[in-house]
């Protein structure tokens, strides 16, 4: 996500969101901060019109560029539908509802051990499969979070693995707009129908 905004714009967005630099790319936390700051900066609530306009502009650019970064890799072709930018409020967790964590990782031991050869259709395994396909297609490593949302790229971006890495990763993916993941949501819902 380093390529999404210029360094100055990135720092300005984080400053307006009142977030530390290490949270750059954590979409869920950035979105929460955006909502909080929007309430504080809104002109009707006594905030600054200029700051609100700047925040909206930077936030809109950030979201659009992350989406473009992901889709300009060619995508995997799995996605059944695309939402307009206004529909990006539909998070992955909203899409799968109460069963999100069950659909995120169906068989934790199997999914975590069979990194390269899993035929599982949980979100974790599908994102890993995308990683392999995208890297074969592009013939390059993932250097930027946003190109890939697999567990390994998440750990590389946010630091070394910990005991709670799977929970942190599940929460990270939960807040992502479902379109950004480029998943066939039908195969996640209905694993018996997936190829």
From Swiss-Prot:
Predominant localisation class: host cell
Q: Which SMART domains match?
A: DnaJ
Q: Which InterPro entries match?
A: DnaJ_domain, J_dom_sf, Papo_T_antigen, Papo_T_antigensf
**What are the protein's GO molecular function terms?**
zinc ion binding
Gene3D superfamilies attached to this UniProt entry = DnaJ domain (1.10.287.110), Small t-antigen, unique domain (1.20.120.1860)
Modified sites of kind N-acetylmethionine: 1
The cellular component terms of Gene Ontology attached to this UniProt record, alphabetical and capped at eight, are: host cell cytoplasm; host cell nucleus
Q: Where are the zinc fingers (H1C3-type)?
A: 131-153
Q: What does this protein do?
A: Promotes efficient viral genome replication by accelerating both G1 and S phase progression of the cell cycle. Inhibits host PP2A by binding to the A subunit, thereby displacing lower affinity regulatory B subunit. Inactivation of PP2A in turn results in the transactivation of cyclin A and cyclin D1 promoters. Late during the infection cycle, ST may induce dephosphorylation of host MTOR, leading to the inhibition of cap-dependent translation. May establish and maintain high levels of viral genomes during persistent infection in cell culture.
Question: What is the name attached to this protein's record?
Answer: Small t antigen
Specify the species.
Murine polyomavirus (strain A2)
């Amino acid at each position: 996500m380093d390529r999404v905004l210029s360094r100055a714009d990135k720092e300005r967005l984080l400053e307006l969101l009142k977030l530390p630099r290490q949270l750059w790319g954590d979409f869920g936390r950035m979105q929460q901060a955006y909502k909080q700051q929007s309430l504080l900066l809104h002109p009707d609530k006594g905030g600054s019109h200029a700051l609100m306009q700047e925040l909206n502009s930077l936030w809109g650019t950030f979201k659009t560029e992350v989406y473009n970064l992901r889709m300009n890799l060619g995508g995997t072709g799995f996605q059944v539908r695309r939402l307009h930018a206004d529909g990006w409020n539909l998070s992955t967790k909203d899409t799968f509802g109460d069963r999100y964590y069950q659909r995120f990782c169906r068989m934790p031991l199997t999914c975590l051990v069979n990194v390269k050869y899993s035929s599982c259709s949980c979100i974790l395994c599908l994102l890993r499969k995308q990683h392999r396909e995208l890297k074969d297609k592009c013939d390059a490593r993932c250097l930027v979070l946003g190109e890939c949302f697999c567990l390994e790229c998440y750990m590389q971006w946010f630091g070394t693995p910990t005991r709670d890495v799977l929970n942190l990763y599940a929460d990270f993916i939960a807040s992502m707009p479902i379109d950004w993941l480029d998943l066939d949501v039908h195969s996640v819902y209905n694993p018996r129908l997936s190829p």
